Amino acid sequence: MSGSAAKVISIARGEVGTHEKREGGHWVNDSKYNRWFGRIPGYGQDGYGYPWCAVFVAWVADKAGVPSLYPKTAGCSTAVNWHKSKGRWSAYPAVGAQVFYGSGGGAHTEIVYAYDATYVYTIGGNTNTNGSAEGDGVYLRQRARRDAYLYGYGLPAFPEGVVTADPALKGKQGFTYKATASAPAGSEAPKPKYEPFPGADFFRKAPRNAIVTAMGKRLVAEGCSAYKDGPGPQWTEADRKSYAKWQRKLGYSGADADGWPGKSSWDKLHVPNV
């Protein structure tokens, strides 16, 4: 690992694909990051149902061992003021920076992992990539640098210094100017312990491979077997019926428990990486 920025980005990337709780057909903001941060009175889900994009950033910083370099808050506006009060604010991106969106930066926040002349590349919590108003998880995003919605950047005081596109910081101690910057070495996410969701279409094509076998064994272990001969590598109707049992065990019903795997239920099944 080459530095704190790389560690932050690696931790954040490892969370891509994590989702908040879903209830009654809607995402309800209750995430593992909220549970780490704590209750906020007045919100649903027993105080855990609040927007969590800023909390995600604080959680990542904590897990990366640099909690003092990012604000620990659930409020984006509070986080903006935190960076500004430390003189760590810029209109230009930086690797590992906390980017803010909306009026005064109060609408949303993410972590920058790379940038070029046109785009900033980020990892964000409580967002999505489908255009829905309901943010539901952690995603990789690409944002236009000159989009009016983008407000600015907080620059953490990394011990190794900050790589930034801000020309005003060129030559200043603690900063390295780069017009474009890739993600730092060592910032790759670790190989997942569990098999990533292969996509809904994967199963509808009746695949035959080790993923299907591993899934079937986990369904049996969860008491959700509809198999007569035991799970095997070929996707069959027995797999679909077994998976429907798993969906019902999770509380899904109707079309949400039709036996076709979805990402949320798949992630909870913890199929070993094959």
Predicted regions and their residues:
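Sec/Tat-exported extracytoplasmic proteins
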Residues: 12-23, 61-68, 124, 219-226, ...
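Aromatic- and glycine-rich peptidoglycan recognition patches
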Residues: 3, 87-88, 109-188
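Acidic, Ser/Thr/Pro/Gly-enriched interdomain connector segments
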Residues: 179-233, 238
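Stable alpha-helical elements in mature extracytoplasmic
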Residues: 4-11, 53-56, 60, 92, ...
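N-terminal capping segments
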Residues: 1-64, 173-198
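...with weaker cross-activation on analogous glycine-rich loops/strands in unrelated enzymes
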Residues: 66-130, 263, 267, 273
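A glycine-rich, coil/turn loop motif that links secondary-structure elements
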Residues: 27-38, 42-51, 86-89, 202-209, ...
